[in-house]
Each structure stands twice: as C-alpha cells, then as structure tokens.
Amino acid sequence: DIIGTIPSMYAGALSFLERNLKHVQNGQNFNTQGELEVSKIALEEIVQNSLTHRDYTKNAPIRLLIFDDRIEIISPGVLPNSLTIEGIKMGNAVVRNNLISSFSTKILNYRGLGSGIIRAIRNQPNLELYNDKVGEQFIVKIPRM
C-alpha cells in the first residue's frame, strides 16, 4: 500500500512503477541504465490525474496493476458530470476536487487543467481509457513491450 500525503503517494506510485517495469536500451550504450519500457511522462500524468481527480467519496484505493502485457491504473469514480473520454482527449475538464486541484499546481508537476490526458496520449499514443460506469471506476491501460 502507498499511503501518505498526495506528494508522497505520487512519488511512491512512480517509484513502484519504475522499479517493476522493464528498462530497455533503445540503441543506447551497453552500460547505460536504459529507458522505461513505457513513457515516463505518460505515467506521471496518469498517476497525477488519478490522485487529483479521483472520487474521494468512494472508499476504494487507486490501484496500480502490472501484467505481462499491460499496466492498469484504476481510479475510484467515473468521469464527472457530462465529461466523456472523447472530451478529455480534446482537453475538456471538469474539476471534481477543487481544493486538491488548486494545490496540485504547487505540490505536483501539474501543467494545467485539461492538459494531462493530452500530454499522456502524445507521449504514449497506444494508451487506452475506459470510463467504467458499472464498476464506478476510471481505467487507464498502457500496453507493455
């Protein structure tokens, strides 16, 4: 379990993902550490979004799951109001947690409302977004190499 303040949970989540994902050479020298098998920028944006925009009225944790073929980041709660997957891909946003969103600009690598999903997709074009209304959760799936 990753618990604590939002900045410590953010750092803990990224640390967990980086420790448990492969690093690949991608043409680098033999002795280099290599690059993460998926976009680190996309992971940062998705983890940040999951902490900032999750539904805190749901008594459920954010889940970070690593499978052989994919990574899943699951946030409690569906997209708020009339927000859709297509809309967030275009930068549309609805603030669910006003106080957390306002502090995110100061405590995280927050780049502005509505820009995170666009940036994640630009850096990891094959990621998939699911607004699971039955399970009341938002799921991001990132295929692995």
PLM ranges: what are they?
Residues D1-A11, V38-M145:
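Conserved beta-strand-loop-beta-strand hairpin that lines the nucleotide-binding pocket
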Residues D1-L36:
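Helix-loop-beta hinge of the Bergerat
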